[in-house]
């Protein structure tokens, strides 16, 4: 009958669309997996080249009307007993960290060779609680210059040597260019 033929055509079309969607999602998953593994690779190499104890990326979201920020990627020095802070830094409301976040989005670099120089009490308390003594932030932007994230490196000793400082800054600059 006409109804059965129409249902059969509908089922065939639905199955075709399902297969197409699965293929597209499979491609996207594979592509995302490649991108994510590249980013983790860059972070891993950076951590060792800079002798950092923790390296990661903070990202605002949603990008259209930034309300939150989260630690989306993080590498921690292995076998050091250092705990990851990625789980703690998820869906932080920007309104609660407004001074810090506005600076992350506006300044290319925020560098604290000694956290005692951090004026934002909330950021200071968080860094101090985690045992951080020096922290470097490098803003990441898209092709239009809009803020899409911040690369950070944390050190458990103050960074005072100018050669080490220059090495860290150079390494972060190179990785920022690769990640953006």
Regions found by a protein language model. Name each.
Residues 75-130:
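Regulatory sensory and allosteric helical modules in signal-transduction proteins
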